[in-house]
C-alpha cells in the first residue's frame, strides 16, 4: 500500500467515532490534570505489577462496512427453516411500528434502569402496562416488570414458595410435563438451596408432601386440563403451587389464577419478540397480594410527586439486592425491560380483540391439523389442546422426522412421538406441507368448515376463558399505526437516554451503543432461529459464539468461556457454582465460606447466599482498599471452610488496589478460589486482565464494557470466563449443550444469543489497539472530571499518585452537614441542568459515584462539570441564608414546564434559575415531566396496576 493510500485508509476510523475526546481535546485534558501524556497518566494510575507485559493478540480492527460484511457471513451460515418445535419459543410478527420506534430506537434502548423516576416516566408507564397485561391474562393480583427467562422465573417461583410457605418440607414437586429446559434450571437452583426436586405426574402432587410445586399449563406436550382440584388439594397440604403458562393461550383458556395458582410464571416472547436462538425475552411472574413483598424482580408502582400529581416509580426496592444484600429476595439486578416494553406495546397495539383473534387463529390452525391427522388414522397424545399437539408415532417416529427434515421443516422429536406447535405466523401452506409429510389427503378448507360449528371443541368447557382482559383504556385506544406511533413517541419524550446527554452512573458504564453494532440484531438470520433447532442449522451462531469466546479469552486471560448467563447476576451465580463444583470434585464440598469486601456490589452477597454460602465481610481501609490484616485474620479463622473471595477490580471505590495479586495469593494459599466481578472491566481491557491478576473466574457485563445497550433495565448478558481447572464446571444444557447436559442457569444454551453480535461487532471494529485506547480514554475522562470537581467537592478515594480509575466518588456528607443539601437534592437538581444523576449512595452512603466512560467528549464533560460546580455555588447560597433550606432550587428540584407556567411564583429564586440554570439549557432543554416523586407514599399506598380512567381525565 502506498504512503498516500495508507494516509487515506479509514480502516480504524471507528475508534475515533467511539471515543469522545479527539487528540487535541485529550491534550487539553491532560494539561488540566497535569499529566504529560496519556501513557504517563496510565503509568501513574495502573500499578506496574498488574500491567500486561504484551499487547492483546486480536485481529486488526475492521471498518463498519467490513464488520457488517463479516457478520453477514456468520448470519448466512444459519439456516432459517419452518419451525414448529414450540417448547416455549414461537415465531411471531413484530409490528413494524414497534420494531422501528422501539427496538431500533436509541431513545428506548440506551436508557438506564429507572432508578431516577422523574426522568423515566415513559418506560415506567410502559412497564406498568406490562404488569397490567400479565395480571389480566394470568388472573393474578400483582406482577413484576419482567425476569430473565421462563426457566429462571420458575426457579425464582420455587424460592418464593419456600419463603412464603408454611410447610417444613424440603421437597419441590415438578410435573413431568413441564418444559425440559425449565426442569434443568430448577435442578441447578434447588441443589444449592438444599431442596429435593421430585418429578412426577401432575395427579401425584396431592399425595406429595412438598413446600411448593410447578405445573405447566398448557403442558409441554400441549395438553389443556383443569388444574383446579389438583391445586386445591395441594394447597390443603401447605404446598404453594406455581404454574408456568402461556400468555397467548390465556386469551382463550381459563387463566391459571382462576384455577387457584399461588404464583404464575412464563415468557412474553411470543408477544412480538423474535426467538433469537433463545433470547433475550421478557419472562413474567405474577402472584397473590399476600406474597407481594417476597416477589423477586423490579415492580413498578403508582405514587405521587411533590405537587400531589400521579407519578410512577420502582416500588418496594427494599426487597432488592442493592439494599438487602445477602438477605434479598433474589440476586436479580438487570431484568428485560426493553423486551417487556415490546411485549406490552404488542398488547397495547392489538388490544383484547386483537390478541383474542390471534389466539383464535392459532388454535383454529392447530385444530385443523389435529383433525386431518386423526381422520388419517393418527392418534394424539391429548385431544385437549391450544396450539400444540403431540402425535403418537411409535416406530414411524424417526422416518417421519427425517421426512420433515428433508422438507426443511423442524418438528419436536420425542420418544415415540412427534410434537407440533403453531403460532401467529402459521399459514395454510404450512398445514399443507405437514399433511404431505404425514400423508394426509384432507382439505384444509373442508376441515376448517367442519370445525367452525364448534370452534373450541378442543378446549374442555371447564378450561375455557369467560373473563375479560386488557380492559384498561391504554389497551383500547392505540390501534391505528398513527395512534401507536404517537403514543410511543409521547412515552419516549418523557425519558432521559443517551440521546439527551451523558448518563454518568458509576459502575454502570453507560457508553456508546453504536448503530453499526445494533444493525445485525434485527436480521432474520439471527432473530428467527429456534434455540432447540438441530445444531447444524445454527452454524453461524456456533461460529460467532466460538470466535467471541476466543476474543474474550484473549482479553481476560482466561482459558474458557460460557455465554449462557443472561445477566451479570446470573453470571455471578454460574461462577460461584463452578467454584463449588470444583471443591466438590476434590472432596472438599464442605468449603462454603465466601469472603466479600464491605465495598462489594449488592449482587455479590446476594449471589453467595443463593449458593448457600456463608458470607463473611472483609473490612476496607481508609483508602478504600481491602484491609490485608483483616483479610488475613478472616482467612485464618475460616481456612478449613474457605471457598472463595469475591472482589471487584478496579474496586468499587474507583481505585486500582496495588495489593490485588497478594489478595489472590493469600486466598489460593488457603485453598480458596478468587471470583473477580467483571463490572469494572472497562478499566482493565488492554492494560491488565483478571487472569493475569490471579483470578480464577469472572463474569463480564456485556451490557457495560462490551456495548450491549442497557435497554432501560435490560437486556444484559453475563458470560463467565474461567481458568482451565474450572472449565469442566461451566454450565451445561440439556439441548445442544456444549459443556454437557447439567447445571444450566438459563433456558437456552447461548442465553440471549441474538445480542451476542453487538459485542462481537464492537471488538471487531476496535481491535486490540482501539480497545486499549478506549480504556485509557475512560481513565482520562474520569480523572479530568475528578480534577475539575476536586476544588469544589471532596473526592473520597484516590490511588497512590492521586489518580482514580474509570470512576470517582465525591463525598457529599460533609457538604450536607455544612449546607443541609443532600446527595439526592444534587441528583434531582442535575435533571434541571439536563443530566442523569451519578450513582447515589453506592458504595458509600451519602456519596455520588461518577463514571463518564470513554464515549463522552470534552464539551459534554465540561457541561457536566460546569453543572456540578454551579450546584455547589447554589449550595453555598443556601448555607449563607440567601435561600431558605426548605425552599430553594435544590430541594424543589426537578422543575417542570408546569412549574414555569405557574401563575403564582412564591419561590425566593427566579423561574429562569429554576428551569434554565445554564447557557446549555437555553440552547437545548430536557424537561422532567413530574416533580420529585414521593417514594414513601408509593410504598405505603402500593398500587402496581394501571391507574383508572379518572386519573387520565384529571
From Swiss-Prot:
Lineage: Bacteria, Pseudomonadati, Pseudomonadota, Gammaproteobacteria, Vibrionales
Keywords: Oxidoreductase, Pyridoxal phosphate
GO terms under cellular component: cytosol; glycine cleavage complex
CDD domains given in the database record: GDC-P
Family affiliation: Belongs to the GcvP family.
Native organism: Vibrio vulnificus (strain CMCP6)
Catalytically driven reaction(s): N(6)-[(R)-lipoyl]-L-lysyl-[glycine-cleavage complex H protein] + glycine + H(+) = N(6)-[(R)-S(8)-aminomethyldihydrolipoyl]-L-lysyl-[glycine-cleavage complex H protein] + CO2
Enzyme class: oxidoreductase
InterPro entries: GcvP, GDC-P_C, GDC-P_N, GDC_P, PyrdxlP-dep_Trfase, PyrdxlP-dep_Trfase_major, PyrdxlP-dep_Trfase_small
GO molecular function: glycine binding; glycine dehydrogenase (decarboxylating) activity; pyridoxal phosphate binding
Function, in words: The glycine cleavage system catalyzes the degradation of glycine. The P protein binds the alpha-amino group of glycine through its pyridoxal phosphate cofactor; CO(2) is released and the remaining methylamine moiety is then transferred to the lipoamide cofactor of the H protein.
Keyword flag Oxidoreductase: yes
SUPFAM superfamilies linked to this entry: PLP-dependent transferases
Domain of life assignment: Bacteria
Gene: gcvP
Quaternary structure note: The glycine cleavage system is composed of four proteins: P, T, L and H.
Protein name: Glycine dehydrogenase (decarboxylating)
Amino acid at each position: 500500500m502506498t504512503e498516500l493510500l495508507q494516509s487515506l485508509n479509514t480502516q480504524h476510523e471507528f475508534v475515533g467515532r467511539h471515543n469522545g475526546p479527539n487528540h487535541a481535546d485529550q491534550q487539553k485534558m491532560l494539561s488540566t490534570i497535569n499529566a504529560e501524556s496519556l501513557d504517563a497518566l496510565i503509568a501513574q494510575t495502573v500499578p506496574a505489577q498488574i500491567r500486561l507485559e504484551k499487547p492483546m493478540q486480536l485481529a486488526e480492527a475492521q471498518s463498519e462496512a467490513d464488520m457488517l460484511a463479516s457478520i453477514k457471513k456468520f448470519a448466512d451460515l444459519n439456516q432459517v427453516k419452518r419451525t414448529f418445535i414450540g417448547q416455549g419459543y414461537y415465531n411471531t410478527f413484530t409490528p413494524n411500528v414497534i420494531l422501528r420506534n422501539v427496538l431500533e430506537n436509541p431513545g428506548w434502548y440506551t436508557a438506564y434502569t429507572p432508578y431516577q423516576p422523574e426522568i423515566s416516566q415513559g418506560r415506567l408507564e410502559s412497564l406498568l402496562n406490562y404488569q397490567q397485561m400479565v395480571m389480566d391474562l394470568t388472573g393474578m393480583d400483582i406482577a413484576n416488570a419482567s425476569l430473565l427467562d421462563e426457566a429462571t422465573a420458575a426457579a425464582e417461583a420455587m424460592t418464593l414458595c419456600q419463603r412464603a410457605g408454611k410447610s417444613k418440607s424440603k421437597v419441590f414437586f415438578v410435573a413431568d410435563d413441564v418444559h425440559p429446559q425449565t426442569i434443568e434450571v430448577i435442578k441447578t437452583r434447588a441443589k444449592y438451596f438444599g431442596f429435593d426436586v421430585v418429578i412426577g405426574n401432575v395427579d401425584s402432587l396431592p399425595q406429595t408432601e412438598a413446600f411448593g410445586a410447578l405445573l405447566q399449563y398448557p403442558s409441554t406436550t400441549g395438553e389443556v386440563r383443569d388444574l383446579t382440584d389438583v391445586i386445591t388439594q395441594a394447597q390443603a397440604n401447605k404446598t404453594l403451587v406455581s404454574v408456568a403458562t402461556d400468555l397467548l393461550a390465556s386469551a382463550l383458556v381459563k387463566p391459571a389464577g382462576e384455577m387457584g395458582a399461588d404464583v404464575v410464571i412464563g415468557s412474553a416472547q411470543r408477544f412480538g419478540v423474535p426467538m433469537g436462538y433463545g433470547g433475550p425475552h421478557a419472562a413474567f411472574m405474577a402472584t397473590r397480594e399476600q406474597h407481594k413483598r417476597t416477589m423477586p424482580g423490579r415492580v413498578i408502582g403508582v405514587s405521587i410527586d411533590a405537587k400531589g400529581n400521579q407519578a410512577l416509580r420502582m416500588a418496594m426496592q427494599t426487597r432488592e439486592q442493592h439494599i438487602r444484600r445477602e438477605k434479598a429476595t433474589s440476586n436479580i439486578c438487570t431484568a428485560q425491560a426493553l423486551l417487556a416494553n415490546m411485549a406490552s406495546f404488542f398488547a397495547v397495539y392489538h388490544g383484547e380483540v386483537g390478541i383474542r383473534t390471534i389466539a383464535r387463529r392459532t388454535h383454529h390452525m392447530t385444530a385443523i391439523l389435529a383433525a386431518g391427522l386423526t381422520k388419517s388414522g393418527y392418534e394424539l397424545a391429548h385431544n385437549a389442546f391450544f396450539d400444540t399437539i403431540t402425535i403418537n408415532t411409535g416406530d414411524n417416529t424417526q422416518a417421519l422426522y427425517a421426512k420433515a427434515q428433508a422438507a426443511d421443516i423442524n418438528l419436536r422429536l420425542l420418544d415415540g412421538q412427534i410434537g407440533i406447535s403453531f403460532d401467529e405466523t402459521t399459514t395454510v401452506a404450512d398445514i399443507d406441507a405437514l399433511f404431505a409429510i404425514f400423508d394426509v389427503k384432507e382439505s384444509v378448507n373442508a376441515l376448517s368448515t367442519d370445525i367452525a360449528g364448534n370452534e373450541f371443541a378442543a378446549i374442555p368447557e371447564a378450561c375455557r376463558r369467560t373473563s375479560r382482559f386488557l380492559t384498561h383504556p391504554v389497551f383500547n385506544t392505540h390501534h391505528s399505526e398513527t395512534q401507536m406511533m404517537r403514543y410511543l413517541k409521547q412515552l419516549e419524550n418523557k425519558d432521559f437516554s443517551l440521546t439527551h446527554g451523558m448518563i454518568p452512573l458509576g459502575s454502570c458504564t453507560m457508553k456508546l451503543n453504536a448503530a453499526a453494532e445494533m444493525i445485525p440484531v434485527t436480521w432474520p438470520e439471527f432473530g428467527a432461529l429456534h434455540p432447540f433447532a438441530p445444531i447444524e442449522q445454527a452454524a453461524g451462531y456456533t461460529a460467532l459464539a466460538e470466535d467471541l469466546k476466543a476474543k474474550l479469552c484473549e482479553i481476560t486471560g482466561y482459558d474458557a468461556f460460557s455465554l449462557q448467563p443472561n445477566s451479570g447476576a446470573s453470571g455471578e451465580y454460574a461462577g460461584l457454582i463452578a467454584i463449588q463444583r470444583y471443591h466438590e470434585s476434590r472432596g472438599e464440598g464442605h468449603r462454603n465460606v465466601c469472603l466479600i469486601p464491605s465495598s462489594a456490589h449488592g449482587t455479590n452477597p446476594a449471589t453467595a447466599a443463593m449458593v448457600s454460602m456463608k458470607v463473611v465481610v472483609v473490612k476496607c481501609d481508609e483508602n478504600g482498599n481491602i484491609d490485608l490484616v483483616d483479610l488475613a485474620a478472616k482467612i485464618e479463622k475460616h481456612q478449613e471452610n474457605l471457598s472463595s473471595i469475591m472482589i471487584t477490580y478496579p474496586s468499587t471505590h474507583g481505585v486500582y488496589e496495588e495489593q490485588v495479586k497478594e489478595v489472590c495469593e493469600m486466598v489460593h494459599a488457603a485453598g480458596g478460589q478468587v471470583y473477580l466481578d467483571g463490572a469494572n472491566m472497562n478499566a482493565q481491557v488492554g492494560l491488565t486482565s483478571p487472569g493475569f491478576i490471579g483470578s480464577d473466574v469472572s463474569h463480564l457485563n456485556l451490557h457495560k464494557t462490551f456495548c450491549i445497550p442497557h435497554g432501560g433495565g435490560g437486556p444484559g448478558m453475563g458470560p463467565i470466563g474461567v481458568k482451565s481447572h474450572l472449565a469442566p464446571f461451566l454450565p451445561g444444557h440439556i439441548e445442544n449443550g456444549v459443556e454437557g447436559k447439567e447445571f444450566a442457569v438459563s433456558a437456552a444454551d447461548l442465553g440471549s444469543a441474538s445480542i451476542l453480535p453487538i459485542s462481537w461487532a464492537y471488538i471487531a471494529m476496535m481491535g486490540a489497539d482501539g480497545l486499549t485506547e478506549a480504556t485509557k480514554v475512560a481513565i482520562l475522562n474520569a480523572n479530568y472530571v475528578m480534577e475539575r470537581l476536586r476544588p469544589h467537592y471532596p473526592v473520597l478515594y484516590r490511588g497512590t499518585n492521586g489518580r482514580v480509575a474509570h470512576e470517582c466518588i465525591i463525598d457529599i456528607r460533609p457538604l450536607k452537614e455544612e449546607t443541609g443539601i443532600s446527595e439526592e437534592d444534587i441528583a434531582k437538581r442535575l435533571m434541571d441542568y439536563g443530566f442523569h444523576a451519578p450513582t447515589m449512595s453506592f458504595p458509600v452512603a451519602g456519596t455520588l459515584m461518577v463514571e463518564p466512560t470513554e464515549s463522552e467528549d470534552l464539551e459534554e464533560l465540561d457541561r457536566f462539570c460546569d453543572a456540578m460546580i454551579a450546584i455547589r455555588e447554589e449550595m453555598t447560597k443556601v448555607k449563607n441564608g440567601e435561600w431558605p433550606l426548605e425552599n430553594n432550587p435544590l430541594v424543589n428540584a426537578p422543575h417542570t414546564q408546569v412549574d414555569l407556567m405557574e401563575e403564582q411564583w412564591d419561590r425566593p429564586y427566579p423561574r429562569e434559575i429554576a428551569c434554565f440554570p445554564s447557557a446549555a439549557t437555553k440552547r437545548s432543554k430536557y424537561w422532567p415531566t413530574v416533580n420529585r416523586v414521593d417514594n414513601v407514599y408509593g410504598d405505603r399506598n402500593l398500587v402496581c396496576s394501571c391507574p383508572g380512567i379518572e386519573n387520565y381525565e384529571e
